[in-house]
Amino acid sequence: MNKKFWLSLLTVVMVTSLLAACGGGKENNSAGGTSAAGNEGGKEDKVTFTYFNAAAGKDKNTNETTIGKIFEEQTGVNFKMEHLVGDENTKVGTFIASNDYPDVIVPGSSIDKLVGAGSFIPLNDLIDQYGPNIKRVYEPYFNLMKADDGNIYFLPLSAVTGEYTSAPNIEQGAFWVQRRVLKEAGYPKIKTFDEYLTLIREYVKKYPDEGLTGYLSLTTEDKFFAFTNAPMHLAGYPNDGGIIIDMETHQANDYADDDITKRYLQELNQLNAEGLFDKSSFVDNYDQYLAKLSSGKVLGFFDYRWQAGQAMNNLREASNKSGNDDLEYMALPIVYDENTKDQYLDPPSFVNNRGVGISVSAKDPERIVKFFDNLLTDENQILSNWGIKDETYSVDENGRFYRTEEQITQTNTDAFRESFGFKYFEYNWPRYGNGSTLPDGNSVGAGRQPEVAQMSYSEGDKKLLEAYDIASFSQLFSAPDERPWYPAWSIPIDQGSPSQIFTQKKSDLQRKYFPKLVLASPSDFEGVWNEYIGEFNKLDVKQYEELITDEVAKKIANVKGQ
């Protein structure tokens, strides 16, 4: 298939777009915003604030990156960025106990704990006074952002502006398999979990002396959901967290004790008995997990692309040098049963329990809000996502953004992404959410631009796409059904409440029993499962399910403006 054919197909796939749910894509939040010079005249003195991101990463000053230096020139503001080492709850607990915080915090699952402890300042008045761009981007979502007391304590990361554009490639969860496995089998159409595991078993059987790992799991404390979420996806549901929402009744069901969870664990138990499951999955840290994926020895795994991205980028760099993409992975929409519709792709959504907050320790919150506001111009969102014209992206005669092969190779290199600042500024700051478009029709995210997707495909990519008769990798997956509440995991749960205590006890129970269930001899599996269920039944799951059901109903009403 020639380049023109690919581009036309991808353009049809991606230009046909939906207005984002939850008020996304409304005209009132699609204008370009106040100029990047800011909304006040005159330059202020330079200042450095502290910034903590509850995710792994390399500590750095923002002005040590190309993008961050430009932002410092615009605003006089630099941030000393610190990233998480160890356990998030332990780190956040230290902040709370000392009442001494970084100026800016980007929490993960601890965000409810920080809000409950009064760690963040209210932003309402600051937005009114210093945040015209913040208001333009976020105002359609204000009813979803306010706490029970009416205050806004953090700015979420998923406010869609303009029309919603779906991703051509898989950005979220999937069952991944090495390309050489598909090639060896003649590029079969794989849908069920049984077919997926059979594919892996047959490849290992054919190459027994290569030291291959059939299946690997990510189970670190802060990423354990990558292990527990798999049964939900196999049953045909999207990532609502540890809960399934019925499409008709909107009733919530915790599936931790359901057959779909038992079936997944039992399949892994059998893989382990055959020597195909990596036992170290339950003790490896995140870096060790990424190293194993990068090694080329792991045939299959379930995870979210954004968690395994560093390893996948490493593999792409290696294949670019060698010209052989056998060790790269392809995402598959695997489900348990042939007649189940997969739902891996996220519907348009607004995640209102993740974001960026200003702490009570911040000495100059007005200056920080001005910096945030300055980020939210079209000009600076282009800088954060595309970079600098004629250096990291180009523009054709019709005003369409694209990247040359050289620019794509450069901007996909991990070291360059770090030094330029893409790695820091594409996410974890106030931003136009994934799927946003600019007023001129260009995608905010370079990866969702049809021209970039087409040019990014290697010869190996194109061979795979042709083999499966698709124009982009996401076409292998079913379109997402509308879910106004999505994602349910964004529903805030009060610290110390019965529901929060339940989720913590459930998590502790899963961490204790799931390794046992996978590593037990197959003859002992039923006994260990029954022991686990006995302990699970002591927990108050009913009140948790009732809470989520009620909150889902409220979110649906808010989204629909009822």
Language-model features: locations:
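Carboxylate/His-rich catalytic cores and anion/metal-binding grooves
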Residues: S119-K146, I200-Y203, G211-H250, G300-N320, ...
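Conserved N-terminal structural module of periplasmic/extracytoplasmic solute-binding proteins
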Residues: N2-S8, G23-E195, Y207, P238-I244, ...
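Conserved small-residue motifs centered on glycine
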Residues: L383-P515
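Extracytoplasmic/periplasmic substrate-binding proteins
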Residues: A55-T62, T161, N169-W176, K183-K189, ...
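Sec-dependent signal peptide hydrophobic core
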Residues: F5-M14, R367
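Helix-loop-helix "hinge/cap" segment bordering the ligand-binding cleft or interdomain interface
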Residues: N151, P156-F225, D246-F301, V356-N398
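Paired acidic/hydrophobic, glycine-rich loop segments that form the ligand-binding mouth/hinge
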Residues: P102-V106, L299-Y304
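C-terminal motif of bacterial Sec signal peptides marking the signal peptidase cleavage site
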Residues: S17-A21
